[in-house]
């Protein structure tokens, strides 16, 4: 792991080396000129999927951090700087690395960057993470098919492992769970750990689960996904084992 500074930019890479193109790695235009953009996804901003296996060992997802809500209309992507380790991209990078090393199915963090403004008070942030191949989020799948009982149980066990590490996924919803088709089995992944972190006690865990259930119920009406109380019962039974 290598952390370094170039002018007003700070980088961390999951490699023991410095890259000359460090700045360009976080610019979508660079990858477009290289003809290495292999897809994209729209959310608060655009996440770009990149063909980088020959450079980083895996293909990557490039994401810029944007604010949401009313405040995001006034200030779309600047955050107040206090310490490097608490910036949005560095904090998510370190959390993903911890979970990855603990064996949880999360994207491997590849690199993160922050760029301070002229006064050094605010910063903008970006992150490169592993692209999970051959995967879809649950809502996309559940629009066209039901999932077997074992898949719901796998999701429950995964969330339990996360909670046992005292990590709260503050945006735990059906869109942030991916299902990957790997040979003859399906594997669940958790993504998007922005603003997530360690939380003491147990009081929040049931609330976190309920948040996930509400997201499924919301998408039943909005996207007509196939989700039943039995699906939820299978998930929670595995969680409580």
UniProtKB/Swiss-Prot annotation:
Its EC number is 2.7.1.166. It is found in: Cell inner membrane. GO terms for cellular component: cytosol; plasma membrane. Pathway: Bacterial outer membrane biogenesis; LPS core biosynthesis. It is a peripheral membrane protein. Keywords: ATP-binding, Cell inner membrane, Cell membrane, Kinase, Lipopolysaccharide biosynthesis, Membrane, Nucleotide-binding, Transferase. This is 3-deoxy-D-manno-octulosonic acid kinase. It comes from Haemophilus influenzae (strain 86-028NP).
